[in-house]
Amino acid sequence: MVQKGETREELILGVQKLEAAGIQTSVTFISGLAGPELWQEHAIETGTMIAEMNASYVSLLTLMLQPPCPMLDDYKAGKFKFLTPEEVLAETCLLLQYARPSKPCVFRSNHASNYVSLRGNLPMDNAAMIASLKKCMQDRGLLKDERFRML
């Protein structure tokens, strides 16, 4: 479990207050953070959080671990498993189904850690981004090779 130092509600309220004050916010989420057992819950919780926050910008990275990191220790000990590329895409699809903010939000998933680059505006472009992800799930050749993923 990742300790962020804030609760979900505190993070949402903080973003809402900044946006209400006219300060645009940019928030980043990490795909794969919950591992294979909890990826669906993580996707839904993240998507609904995006919807409730109403941030101006949202970006998505894919989990990669570098030392020193307790999660890396857990991975080496067999206590944590990474999502497969297909699971990361499925998690992102599910997240996008729930990421329906009430005002337009710029969405980017173009970090070097990601298997697929996405760009669009939530919620208007959700369906197109989901379609793009599903196409990539059917053709693994469209995914970024592991050698080119980096932090």
What is each stretch, according to the model?
Residues 1-22, 32-53, 73-86:
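Conserved non-cysteine loop/helix-boundary elements of the Radical SAM core domain that shape
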